[in-house]
Every structure is written in structure tokens, then in C-alpha cells.
From Swiss-Prot:
It comes from the Bacteria. It catalyses: tRNA(Pro) + L-proline + ATP = L-prolyl-tRNA(Pro) + AMP + diphosphate. One of its GO terms (biological process) is prolyl-tRNA aminoacylation. It is found in: Cytoplasm. Consists of three domains: the N-terminal catalytic domain, the editing domain and the C-terminal anticodon-binding domain. This is Proline--tRNA ligase.
Amino acid sequence: MLFSKLFAPTLKEPPKDAVLKSHKHLAQAGYIYQVGSGIYNFLPLAKKVLDKIENITHKRMQEHGAQNILMSFVVLASLWEKSGRLDKYGKELLVFKDRKDNDFVLSPTLEENITEIAANFIKSYKQLPVHLYQIHTKFRDEIRPRFGLVRAREFIMKDGYSFHEDAESLDKEFLNTQSAYKEILNDLGLDFRIVEADSGAIGGSKSKEFVVLTECGEDTIVVCKNCDYAANIEIAKRSKRPEPLNVPKAQLAKFPTPNTTSAQSVAEFFKTEPYFVLKALVRKVIHKDKETLACFFVRGDDNLEEVKALNALNIIGANALELREASQKDLDSAGLIAGFIGPYGLKKHVPYIIFDEDLKEGDCLITGANEKDFHAVGVDLKGFENLVYADIVQVKESDHCPNCQGALKYHKSLEVGHIFKLGQGYAKSLRASFLDKNGKEQFFEMGCYGIGISRLLSAILEQKSDDLGCVWTKNTAPFDVVIVVSNWKDEAQKKLAFEVYERLLQKGVDALLDDRDARFGAKMRDFELIGERLALIIGKQTLENKEFECIKRANLEKQTIKDIELEEKILEMLASE
């Protein structure tokens, strides 16, 4: 490829609204162009990288037995209504009407679509298992699109779905796809982790995320320093904590505690640890057609994990869509006094009350007395009836691993893949069944598997690039080599550049010849910005000494290569990481 023919509109400066380096570099280097909020055009350089990522994905998925299909991006809203997700998904689901007043959605995921296909065409256990996947455009109407391709509204996704006759078969395919995803991310040269995760709006009994480690990541994962335990902070667990020695021994009583509203200040007032203070956190619960309140109790030195709290509510049948901070008006309407909320008589104020599971043996506790400037001491939760307990706290770095007691540590990460065991939920709601070996009708066991193809462009750059521009991995760079001529007006240098270009092409090297009549410094700046793996410099000394200077983009390391061994050395360098 000649640079003069390449459509790569580089910019002098990155967009002013770009925060992450991946967004800055992709826009400034001419990879992407923004159409609207969270919507991007992929220009030739980005398309080359996308093609490489997609080719790796196709190869590994098909090696693991998955079959490639292409489903409609537009899906009947009635299918989403049958599955129950039309309301559950919320405003992120874009719904529209056609000219005949039929409702459709732009798919963020395609569980309903693929389940309908299976229901119509898979009739017998003899056709199972089957794993179908696609790479296609998706749309999710994000409330706050940001960070370029990391949180876009329109994106490219590899999504796959498997159908099975029983849970054992699903378990095998779950592990099979996990292996395929590991191979894909290894091929892409990424440092990643596989972590236990929340299933969210997709649903299912179990899920795992594939996350790329980067300080700019949106997510926090919790990792054990001693064993392989790793989980998204939204569902991370910890081992049971030892009780502090300073136990506040007291008979049940009510004490005046003026202006003492935080767990820390209450602990100091009673000369004990926040561990023994019952902290109440009130949230507004958003349902399909109403709003209610929920109160969550945790120990004073713990924090509420909102995802765990929402899941706990739905386990007890709340059918909650979302949790929000309760306003002062909400508290006043319910007769609650912030800083003094406790379990006594609370049920008449709040319909949903959940205690963290660490409080099951809770005694000698200090709680709000549901009266301004008063707390109760000597509270024993075992004296209350029908309390609901669940794991609702956010794991801290001072906590210990639930598997081996090792120290837990936070890491920032960016999710690039997610696999789910869906079970029979979608099959039952959409009446998707088959006949088993005994001729009896059974619902499919399903799996769901996704990788963010367009997000991977950002993930690679967040992990690998530097302040100068794009640094791609071995299998993802748009070009292997860019040939940079020091003085394009020098006919001898120009002639040699074309000769070298042809020599490299004949060896299968994807080379870019910078044939622009531009300053050498500007050409090198574009090399740093665009991120070809190697830059081969042709200058006056090349002609005199028959030696080339070669620069690795990954670390800007320079190497001198003799003309006689040019092809051999270039291929050697490209084969290495």
C-alpha cells in the first residue's frame, strides 16, 4: 500500500472530549470518525484491525465446533415481550414502529431471535448440541455514551448461543467456549483474567467475564494473591471475618445520641468498633409500574454493593428494575430519620428489609432507634422473626479469599467478553422445546457467549499504547512495516524504497510505503501515531553503507539491518512479540 493512496485522515490534536488514550489515538490517527453520540464510522485503518480480530475469532470459534450465521439486527418487539425483557431492559432498548404500526427493537442481544430459530428447526435430541454464532452490529441506547468505543451506543459484537438436551451438555459447552475465548484473547496478545460475574439483564444461573487489565478500566475485579479466585466486585465474596475483641457488652436499652448519625461517630460515642454498629442504607426501588423503598442493613465498617442488593430483592420476589438513592423527601414520606434508622418497627415504614448475611449471628449490636437523636444498644438480631439475609456487602481489599484465606486485591479492568449459562429461562418463555430419547417434550438448556469486537480495539490500545500513539499487538497492527524515506526528492532513496517495498511484499509482509513528499519528522510522527509494527528508515547512510535503521513501535528500540539480510531480519522481528 502506498501512503499517498491510503485514506487515513490524521488530526493535529485529539478531540477535546476524548478522555481515554484509546479514544484520543483512534480519532487522531484517522481510525474512527464520530457520527453522533456513541456512534462511529470505522475508516480503513480501523477496518483492517477489525478484520484481523474477526478472522482470529472465526478461526477459534469454528475450531471449537461453532457455526457462523448472520441474524437480523431488527427483531419483533413481541418476542422481547414474550421473554419478559421488553420492560426489564429499560430505556437502553431502542423500540420503534414501522409504517404499519408494528413494534420492533434494534437488538442489543439476540437471545429471543435465536431461541425462535431453534424452536422452529430443532425438533429432536439427535440435532443437539448445536452452537451458532455471528459477528454483527448491535445497538444499546446508553444513557451516557463515553470513552470512544469503550461505551458506544452502536458496536460490533460476536455473540453465540448453544442449545442442549441437558445441563451436563451445557456445562461442557460452557467450558469449551471458555477455552475458545482464552485462545482468542491470547492470539490478540492481551493480558486478561477470567472472573466470576453477575448475569445482569441477560439472566441465567452462572456467568464469567473476560476482562483486560488496564488502569483506565470501567470495572473493578477482586483477585486473590494466593489462588486463582477472581470475581467482579459486583458479586465478589469473602471469608467470614473474625470478630473484634472490643465487644460492647450491654443490656438492651435506648440511649440519647445527639447529632451522631454516621457509623463511625456512633462507634466513637460508645467507645467501640464500627463493626458492631448496624448501618442502614435506604434505596428507592424502581418497579415496572411503581416505586417503593428498601432498607439494607450492613455492619458499620462495610459498604453496600448495589448489584448484590438488587439481586437480593429479586430473589424475594420484588421484581425490581433499578435501585436509586432515596431522597430526603422519600425518607420524610416514609417517616424515616436519616442516621437513626433501625430494625424495630421498621416494617411498617419500608416494604423490603434485607440484612447482610454476616449479621446472622449478630448480637451486642448498636442500631438506630427510629427516633431522632437516639440509638439502641445490646440489640440481638436473633430475637427478631423472619429476617431476610443475603450477601449484600462490597468486598474490601482488607478482606480475605473465600477459598484459601489469601489477601484480596483490587484491579481495574475492562470487560471484553462474557459467557452465560442461561438454563431453560428463554426456552420456557418462548416455548422452545424438542423431543428427548423417550419421545418426551423437553425445553432446551441454553448458553450465551459474547465478545465485544469493536471494544477490543480500545482494549488493546488501553493496555499496550503509549502517550505518542497506537501500539498494536503482533496479530492486530494495520501494517507490519512502514518504509520511511528521509528525503523523497532524492531519486536514489526513492528508487531503493520501491525496491525494498517489492522485496517485502514478495515475502508476504504487509508493507506500507510512505511515498508522501513531506517532512521526515512528520512521517515519523505518523508512524508513532498510527502504530505500524516496524518502521524501516531509508536515508543517505542506507545508500552509503547498505544498512537500514529499523524501529520497533512497541518500545521504539532501534536496530541496524544489513541489506543482504533484510528480509530474514524483518520476518524474524515480526515473528517475535
